[in-house]
Regions:
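Short amphipathic alpha-helical coupling elements at transmembrane boundaries
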Residues: 93-103, 211-214, 218, 248-262, ...
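Helix-loop-helix junctions within predominantly alpha-helical proteins
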Residues: 1-68, 100-202, 217-235, 269, ...
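A hydrophobic transmembrane-helix motif
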Residues: 274-294, 379-386
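C-terminal transmembrane module of eukaryotic multi-pass membrane proteins
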Residues: 215, 294, 298, 305-395
């Protein structure tokens, strides 16, 4: 017992603690003030200024399209940061549940399933973190270095800040650039760590379903007196042991359902904003492709639209895998030697089957089911919006 499952989230929570959205159990007064100030200045105020800037933009469609692409990304990061702050108790309850007695095991095969889920979680974090940091470095820090060395004109990495008068642009260039750089970097870290945290808790949920599947297929292995006659003491002992095992499986299944319910409650708003903004971002990227631009900008757009598509597709993919694994529970139940067991065992077995007939699902905003069907619908809506914009543009 005591197998630690949540240590794969140590790096996620450490970075989120630095960013002010995941305090320790008893945070100091300094950290509380730091957290509120940092989140307000570089997340809330950042999006407010970005929104206000649309009023001052030149009346050019391609400029609006460019600004909207990053705007939806920043709104998504804001929703993730605020959700982690206000729904922190649910996230903590979820982590406590992973460390509860119900989800612990000493079986070597079951430990390997959990270890595999943890390794997968860290693998996705490393890939996402590496790509995001590289892209952020090219977008934010490389232009500044080139500006210092070769005196190339420095442009803001995210938002134009068109509300700054021309006579004051030189004065506010470096402070505004620094502010945008810190803001977009923190948003990148919010996105990376919260997105991969969601994938990690889903991987562990699927690992628990795999463990439950394995237990159900072997639930009658506790019966050692297979040839004992009906009504004998040995037969009664075997039936009693089998009933105890199936009851443990029912409790385990209930715990997995409760755990997935906590995932939905903690990430419902995040998923809703992710899917809504994802559709808008893909639409605006497609729309921007129809306008003239430099080659390097088209390369950037291509990479960006691929990343945004994956950001929506990956959780949908594993949401479908979660549904499939929970649906397989009903087949695992009948793979055990249940026919010679007592009536009470069969009654409990039927109860578990009735519960498992409704697969475990996760929804975003009580609207978007986390599945590949939802991903297809999002892509279809993105193209529909794009076609509508093209129709308006050509008139």
């Amino acid at each position: 017992m005591g197998y630690n499952q949540i240590d794969c989230f140590k790096i996620h929570l450490t970075i989120l603690r630095v960013l002010g959205v995941w305090p320790e159990e008893n945070p100091s007064i300094c950290y509380i003030y730091f957290s509120r100030i940092f989140v307000f200045i570089f997340t809330v105020l950042y999006v407010i200024i970005y929104t206000m800037n649309f009023y001052f933009l030149p009346q050019q469609l391609e400029i609006f399209a460019e600004e909207l692409i990053f705007y939806f990304t920043n709104v998504g990061a804001l929703s993730k940061a605020l959700a982690f702050i206000f729904l922190r108790d649910k996230v903590k309850k979820m982590l406590d549940m992973l460390e509860s007695e119900m989800f612990q095991t000493d079986n070597l095969e079951e430990v390997k399933l959990i270890e595999k889920a943890k390794e997968k979680s860290l693998f996705y974090w490393k890939i996402t973190f590496g790509l995001s940091v590289s892209a952020n470095t090219v977008n934010v820090f490389l232009p500044f270095v080139l500006h210092l060395i070769f005196s190339i004109k420095l442009e803001f990495p995210v938002c134009r800040y068109s509300f700054i008068p021309e006579q004051y642009e030189a004065i506010f260039l470096y402070p505004a650039y620094l502010y945008q750089s810190i803001g977009i970097t923190s948003h990148m870290l919010y996105n990376v760590n919260i997105d991969t945290f969601l994938l990690g808790v889903m991987f562990l949920a699927m690992a628990q379903l795999d463990i439950l599947d394995r237990k159900l297929r072997k639930v009658t292995d506790v019966c050692v007196n297979v040839d004992a006659p009906r009504g004998s003491i040995d037969k009664m002992i075997d039936d009693q042991n089998a009933v105890l095992e199936i009851n443990k499986c029912i409790k385990h299944y209930d715990a997995v359902c409760e755990y997935c319910k906590l995932i939905q409650e903690a990430f419902s708003e995040i998923l809703f904003v992710l899917f809504s903004s994802g559709s808008c971002k893909i639409c605006m990227c497609l729309f921007r492709f129809t306008m003239p631009a430099e080659t390097q900008y088209f390369v950037f757009l291509t990479l960006y639209i691929v990343v945004m598509t994956l950001q929506v597709m990956v959780p949908c993919w594993f949401g479908s895998r979660l549904i499939e694994k929970s649906s397989q529970i009903t087949f695992a139940v009948y793979d055990c030697d249940w026919t010679p067991r007592c009536r009470r065992f069969k009654s409990n077995l039927r109860l578990l089957v009735e519960r498992a007939n409704r697969p475990i699902i996760i929804k975003g905003g009580k609207m978007f089911l986390l599945s590949l069907a939802t991903f297809t619908a999002i892509m279809n809506s993105s193209y529909s919006f794009f076609a509508l914009l093209r129709n308006v543009q050509t008139r």
